[in-house]
Amino acid sequence: MAEQEASGLQVLLHTLQSSSDKESILTILKVLGDLLSVGTDRRIHYMISKGGSEALLQTLVDTARTAPPDYDILLPLFRLLAKVGLRDKKIGRKALELEALDVTLILARKNLSHGQNLLHCLWALRVFASSVSMGAMLGINGAMELLFKVITPYTRKRTQAIRAATEVLAALLKSKSNGRRAVNRGYVTSLLGLHQDWHSHDTANAYVQIRRGLLLCLRHIAALRSGREAFLAAQGMEILFSTTQNCLDDKSMEPVISVVLQILRQCYPTSPLPLVTASSAYAFPVPGCITTEPPHDLPEEDFEDDGDDEVDKDSDTEDGKVEDDDLETDVNKLSSKPGLDRPEEELMQYEVMCLELSYSFEELQSKLGDDLNSEKTQYANHHHIPAAASSKQHCYSKDQSSCGQEREYAVQTSLLCRVKTGRSTVHLGSKKNPGVNLYQNVQSNSLRRDSSESEIPDIQASPKADAWDVDAIFCPRMSASFSNSTRTREVVKVIDKLLQTHLKRVPFHDPYLYMAKARRTSSVVDFKMMAFPDVWGHCPPPTTQPMLERKCGVQRIRIFEDIRRLIQPSDVINKVVFSLDEPWPLQDNASNCLRFFSKFESGNLRKAIQVREFEYDLLVNADVNSTQHQQWFYFKVSGMQAAIPYHFNIINCEKPNSQFNYGMQPTLYSVKEALLGKPTWIRTGHEICYYKNHYRQSTAVAGGASGKCYYTLTFAVTFPHSEDVCYLAYHYPYTYTALMTHLDILEKSVNLKEVYFRQDVLCQTLGGNPCPLVTITAMPESNSDEHLEQFRHRPYQVITARVHPGESNASWVMKGTLEFLVSSDPVARLLRENFIFKIIPMLNPDGVINGNHRCSLSGEDLNRQWLSPSAHLQPTIYHAKGLLYHLSSIGRSPVVFCDFHGHSQKKNVFLYGCSIKETLWQAACTVGTSTILEEVNYRTLPKILDKLAPAFTMSSCSFLVEKSRASTARVVVWREMGVSRSYTMESSYCGCNQGPYQCTQRLLERTKNERAHPVDGLQGLQFGTRELEEMGAMFCLGLLILELKSASCSHQLLAQAATLLSAEEDALDQHLQRLKSSNFLPKHIWFAYHFFAITNFFKMNLLLHVSPVCDT
């Protein structure tokens, strides 16, 4: 049958070419038209494959060459060619070979006064010009001159032909040669004039497509440097800017405004950033490295512009896909285990990091109380591992009880009650019940200072609530000589009064201890100040915050404002009000501009420029010893007025996209709010967008290549109080000093009879800061051989975090993990009794301290140094890897290794793991995969977390091994230590668009009122610190269930877990009944039933005395 159809079509096409009978030709054209008018494009492609294009073109040439040409045949022929040509990518080449190109051009010239005939010719020329090379050929043959005869000033006649002519001209101008020809012949001015004329007369917007066609011509010309120069010389920026200002809100004008925006952005002159140098404002002399002169920015003429277009996109193009050509396909590299990168005898030094393997219970007891409140030994050679004496164990007496009470209160509800159900952790605002205050029961003695920590830095503030001068609240660091002065005692009294008057108790935080710790934190430029939020502390807000709904056109408005600066420079103040590169001070307290400051721990703001009265351009600092990685920001701002929107434009961001385009907001901390009892980082800002700007890096900095692009993050903030002091940050800050304070408070809070908690110094960093290593497990029940044997043979779990300083969310997740592991939660107790946790909570302290986003003080990404780290340049990575080597060498490789990270391009929380087979399958390298033996247990933990953790999603997890990730912790620990469950856990800076956190507060209120079901595709909730800490605790729960599902799980642990689950089942059932009775959040009810299925699974396995089967 197919052969008959093919032969029938071929007969028709052959007859069409060979027949000279008009009626036969018209009949065949009608039949072909009917065949192609129904069905899918497959019919057109089929006809093309059988020579349909050639047949139509040949008929066109033959008919056109008859005298006179028969337009009864030519018009339907042109219509068919227009339809077929849209699907035939080679139509232009075929037309050239069969001389149809010239024939059509001749026919168009002959029909300038015949509207319908000309229109059909233009349709054919449009498809021929779809090929750039054919468009160039048409330009050589005078097509553009012809088209300019068709495109006239505003008229209501022959508008179809004029529209078609603009479309053909736009296609021709894709050719660079045609573009240059248009510039040389002055067509840029002509096109601008035509557009102005049509715009001014077409008040009803009836001919928007003609105006768009004219603009497309200009856009293609502007792709050339000469075209942009001609456009600017013809005042094109001013003309297009003014013609669009009155129609920005008109939806019918969207096609025009979109192209105008592209042209204006394309023609905006590129310029260097307003910085002295592209290098960081801070420099650190790296041992053994020669310091080079940082490259300085060059004048504008040094900048190349690639002329790329950028459309105002609102679609989420998060970079979740791995390029197949980056996948590792070498089976030997994937499956082989490299040798040690250091002498084997060197691993012995890490025994001091595993004292739990050698302590007897008597030795451990004798150590308790030793070195009370002593400082960690400071080592002159920071590349050597400290001796065992530097360990800090359970060394605090029971009278330090307040922190324990904080912890007990915070975890009195078991973690099992907060799994992926309609849990209380989605804290929604309510006037009747604002939610349980986790901080009311914290006793005031949590702020008590030890006598050894009397050297308290200076906080200056008025303690009177009615006479606040909050801009005077600052926290300078103090030298040792000054700290003993009378002034210090006076300041301490002020601090005490201020804290007693205003402080809201923050669990696991002590301002006095923080200030004492801050004095011992070493920074590159020796910061003299501390940020108020870090000293005062942070409490999670009582309610969650939904993702910001982005209003249509926000980005467009901000770009037009950028363009206004160029064409109306008199409106721009352009005053530098803060700069790390300029002499201090630049700001006058009496001036009416905002005051900025960032020279404190983790702070990052390099320069602030006042653009307009309430608008500022900001530039963030590059990483120390680097010219890159501008993303993290954290700075103080004061001198504001309330109820006025201030616009901030961070103009030197590097990433091509950001979650700020998809619902994310920066964070804000108000000092006045904190003194009113709300010490909280909140998401803030409106009119947020992220887009490419006109700044470029110079070719000198880029090493001779075309300079990279920069992007602008813009947002507006309406401050809650006038003359407040506020802090703005990319994400919730978490400093190194906060970590060291937190660890000490945790150490004081543990129950010495139950929890084995020890701090070691893994090493000293390049900057001279100790990198902490924490060990957590359960104390042995007694000093009997049996109990000590069980204590020493517990499997290890290794968790690390914050290798990238800007990923502060990783530290909040780690905070949740640490607090949960030392808590009295029954799940935490089971975990301590069955595992030893080795935790390195901050792998890059120097980067965190100095406000870096990605690198250490050496200017290197430490998570790309795991293959062969240097003890001198990357000490934390070198010794972290050494510790893992040591555990592997004694047969104690961790069950799970996980490195906590933050992700700037995707939502939710997810894991990256490693799999040989999945990598090869994805790369389509299936040869030999059948012989590769690989366990599938690497998928078990992600599946567990997907069922338990509200923020986690399995759909974003990946187990591919990329070449570009070969030197990361995840891949190196997997390959070299043989840890099959080696992961990177990524937490979004933004929030969740799945699971319980998918529902926004506004929708929940509507659902409750209307008894409606939530709809899919919601924006979801932004992460707060509460949700991040919860994820850290849920990760721990996942480790327990992973062990329960393993074939090696002991019957004793199964029995303990069954008892625990039975105790929790009643509470979960009551919670489920409440949800059912209120008909609230049906999805969450499903999650609750799902959790009951999990618990029943473990109980059945216990009753049947069968170990659970590994998840496949």
From Swiss-Prot:
One of its GO terms (cellular component) is cytosol. Residues 291-345 are annotated as: Disordered. Its main location: cytoplasm. Residues 732-1022 form the Peptidase M14 domain. It catalyses: (L-glutamyl)(n+1)-gamma-L-glutamyl-L-glutamyl-[protein] + H2O = (L-glutamyl)(n)-gamma-L-glutamyl-L-glutamyl-[protein] + L-glutamate; C-terminal L-alpha-aminoacyl-L-glutamyl-L-glutamyl-[tubulin] + H2O = C-terminal L-alpha-aminoacyl-L-glutamyl-[tubulin] + L-glutamate. It is found in: Cytoplasm, Cytosol. Binds 1 zinc ion per subunit. Metallocarboxypeptidase that mediates deglutamylation of tubulin and non-tubulin target proteins. Catalyzes the removal of polyglutamate side chains present on the gamma-carboxyl group of glutamate residues within the C-terminal tail of tubulin protein. Specifically cleaves tubulin long-side-chains, while it is not able to remove the branching point glutamate. Also catalyzes the removal of polyglutamate residues from the carboxy-terminus of non-tubulin proteins such as MYLK. Interacts with MYLK. Interacts with TCF4. It is linked to Corneal dystrophy, Fuchs endothelial, 8: A corneal disease caused by loss of endothelium of the central cornea. It is characterized by focal wart-like guttata that arise from Descemet membrane and develop in the central cornea, epithelial blisters, reduced vision and pain. Descemet membrane is thickened by abnormal collagenous deposition. This is Cytosolic carboxypeptidase 4. It comes from Homo sapiens. The lineage of its organism: Eukaryota, Metazoa, Chordata, Craniata, Vertebrata.
